[in-house]
Amino acid sequence: MQIDVTNGKRFTEYDVLAAVASGEDVLLVRLADGTGVKRIPLSAVKAFINGDLTTLETEDKTSLIAAINEVFGLAGTNAKGINTLKELTKMLGQTGASRANSFIYEHDLGTSFTAEQSADIRAGKFEKVRTGGYWTINGRKYWAAHADYRLHCGDTELTTHHMLVIPDRSFYNGVMNDTNVTTGAYYGSKMKTSGLADALATVKADFGADHILTHRVLLANAVSNGLSSGWAWYDSQIDLMNEHMVYGSYAWGGGSQNGYDVGADKSQLALFQARPDLITNRENWWLRDVRSATYFCHVDDSGAADAWSASNSLGVRPAFLIY
């Protein structure tokens, strides 16, 4: 066989190989033994090199290069996602109160307060005991409500790491005073004087007396014209919450917006900020703020912020620190 190549060109004489433009164009391949040539359509060569593009799992199936570019683009996006995940993992892996109070989720802490949990709190790590966790001890449910809530507070600085804990429901009902007076404010009330004794005995039995932290608290101790008018620092192990701890602000307490009922407990508990549904447990329970000469504040069973006469018997749902 002879082929006339008088008007032919060498491949190197073409500006670009793309001069062969159609899938119907052919390549003539000389057989190795010199006996002839084979005619190969360019489309067959393309299919051999690229494979079947319809089987690609990419969105773009127009060409192999387009598919490769798409994959590299996805790889870049995925790399960014992986870096973001690494940063999130690093953040969640941090220890301390700020992480414990910021990433709040409900989790079971068991049926007893363990030595391991105590060590975790005392070290200030809060890896085992985080805000949002709960214990069920002797049939009573307790919430871990705020890590290091009173750290660095007090006329004598509190330097011990701790978890503020509250019961899910009131321990029992009690009066603020036997008559409808608020004389002496919270510190001078029957509730503070004797009404919390059984609650303290209960939490000591449930968590261990050595794990209830004695610390200094600033409490209102005088009333003038129906408003709290004085305060002082006292040693304490258990107290009623105030409006700021529950709501994050005044509701009915504070009168002319004095701060005697607030004291050092000026921030909403992290648990209540994340889970306001836990404020309302379908009970009426006392707060320590003075409303008037005859009323103390309370959380109503309907969920409303309210106040009532001091001699009414409402729920006792105090807060305490464990370590």
List where the protein language model places each region.
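Fibrous stalk/shaft segments of extracellular and virion attachment machinery
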Residues: M1-K90
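Collagenous Gly-X-Y triple-helix signature in extracellular proteins
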Residues: A79-Y323
